[in-house]
Amino acid sequence: MTSSDAPVVVGIDGSDGALNAARWAGAVAARFGAPLRIVHALPSVGRNLTQTAAAFTAAMMSYQRDMAEAFLKAADEAVRADNPELSVSTVSFNEPADQVLIDASSDARLVVLGGKKVTPAAALLLGSTALSVATRAACPVVAFRGETVAPGDGPVVVGVDDSPAAQAALESAFEFADRFGLAVNAVRSLSLAAPAETGVTIPLLIDWDGVESAELADLTETVDVHNKRHPGVDAKSFIEPDSPGKALLKHVADSGLVVVGSRGRNALAGVLLGSTSLNLLHHSPVPVMICRAAPQGDSDE
């Protein structure tokens, strides 16, 4: 993550889930010795309105500002009750929620998205906000899930492939686990298609035990690099012959956080990210952290 004075930012919408997210973010900020910034996005004001519409809009905006103040006050009080010594600030903006959080990520350690429970019907809407933030934010992003108001004692589960984003996910997972005294379970998905290096195209001709052993050895070696930086963390590696989303879901039931990587920064990247992350966002009982690889030049992946 980043320096100790960088804040943890949490976006709230006034729902019970958002209040829990604020408390969870407060617990994380307190453990990292970082300040907490609670933000709320108000709808933007319409333009070129008739006099009647303008009057109605002004009244509605006044009501929404009052509600925003109430949301922020409730979140501030709940967080301070949990962590009396924590530095907490609140702010609201008349901008789209995703842009508010993307801008806030520029100097943040972590951005937490609090809101209503995600359903399959809400996937596309959520994709336009949470995944927009995740693929464009300058820091890791957590989509809050579950009912907990602080990280528990379950392991941090992290999805690992051979991408730079997976390295970022591993480092974030180990740092989080180290701060909270948790274990790390690294999970790699194993495709059941014939690996190119075998030179054959028929899966039945593949020594899958050998493939799995090789993948496990490679994953363990990758995990060990990060484990050496955080020697107090107990780390285990797992190979799952399933899709990435399903492979991770096999391990999240008793975990406290699941961490995945985002491979890109553009609209297409959001779609690619969604196939795994949206599955987790629909079904994960715990918060989901999405990490981007460190920028490499100006080109999109």
Q: Locations of the language-model features?
A:
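Glycine-rich, Arg-bearing micro-motifs that act as flexible, cationic patches
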Residues: L113-S132, D153, L257-H283
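Small/aliphatic-rich secondary-structure junction motif
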Residues: T2-A58, G154-I206, N227-H230, D234-A235, ...
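Short beta-strand elements of ligand-binding domains
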Residues: V112-G115, V141-G146, V288-R292
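Short glycine/serine/threonine/alanine-rich loop segments
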Residues: G33-P35, L86, C139, L182-A183, ...
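Short, structured interface segments
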Residues: A130-T148
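General small-molecule cofactor/ligand-binding pocket signal
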Residues: R37-V39, S89-F93, V142, N185-V187, ...
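A short acidic, glycine-rich active-site loop
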Residues: T57-A70, L205-E215
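Structural beta-alpha unit
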Residues: M1-S4, G17, A59-S62, E77-V111, ...
